[in-house]
Amino acid sequence: MAKITLAAARVNTGMTQEEIAERLGVSRATVIQWETGKKEMRPAYLYAYCHLTGFSEDDILLPEVSTD
């Protein structure tokens, strides 16, 4: 199976960034940072994100985190 980005996984399920944030107990800004590679996603959040979207960790293509 081809890898899918965090944003694509979320959109595929019809969820908004706000809905993901609410369910994970983080801010919408954090979800945006994960999706754009501005912040590294901790494994526990990745697991929960995958559970919400129906994808496995192996299906997700995480963006490279920028060090700027």
Cite the ranges covered by each PLM segment:
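Residues within the helices of the helix-turn-helix
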Residues: 7, 18, 47
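DNA major-groove recognition helix of helix-turn-helix/homeodomain DNA-binding modules
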Residues: 44-59
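Short alpha-helical DNA-recognition segment
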Residues: 14-33
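Key DNA-contacting residues within the recognition helix of helix-turn-helix
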Residues: 7, 32-33, 61
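Alpha-helical residues within the helix-turn-helix
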Residues: 11, 22, 51
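Short amphipathic recognition helices of helix-turn-helix/homeodomain-type DNA-binding modules
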Residues: 59-68
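A short, Lys/Arg-rich alpha-helix, primarily the initiator
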Residues: 1-12
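Residue-level detection of the helix-turn-helix DNA-binding "recognition helix"
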Residues: 11, 25, 36-38, 65
